[in-house]
Amino acid sequence: LDKSIAADPHNAQAYAWRACSIGQGLGNGYLEGEMENPFEEIKTMIQKASELDENDFECNRLLCEINKFFEDFEQAEYYGNKACSLNPNDPRILSAMGDLFVITNRAEEGVNLLVKAYELDPMGLGASNADKRIGDVMFGTYVKGDYDLCLEYDKKIGKKHPLAWASLIASLESLGRSQEKSEELKKFKEANPEMLLEEIIEKVHFEDLGAKNKFKELVI
């Protein structure tokens, strides 16, 4: 991306993708200690991308994701709505907005968008199966409180990502199905011996900290 920017300093998407890449690296622990001030760098890239082309769909989609990472939910929704107005049926922005609504106390609306994204493009960009999209719906249905539907989507998934697994386990606990919860916890720990579900949930950018804490309690 540095080379892309050097080759074309007026390419707004290059700045947006660079900001997104740094954010993903921070979120996954890849960039610890490698950049002096990564958060300031992200903000600089966001500002530059927006200045260069405020009506680029891809830029607005990425700016939605980046602001969600920084928990600036108002800005995330602003850019997400702009992206939707430019390309209302792109499953990537439907997925981004669906996730945003789920973590900002609008889970019913969020689940509808996540299901629509799954139906439009089950695999998603760069994926080889539908597991990511289905897992996102499982998370949304758990937050919505539709625990039975979360379990129904679990029947469709191949390999669960950790947040989907946490959503399944929390749904089982919420339904009082303690034995099944214990079995799923055991499977998760065997598959991910160095991973803690509480740490996975901690990385979710819930607007309501109470919802995050309740989620953690249900997976213990």
Q: Where in this protein do the model-derived segments appear?
A:
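Short alpha-helical scaffold segments that flank and stabilize functional sites
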Residues: A7, W17, I22, L52, ...
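Hydrophobic face of amphipathic alpha-helices that form TPR/SEL1-like repeat modules
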Residues: S21-Q24, L63-N67, L100-F101
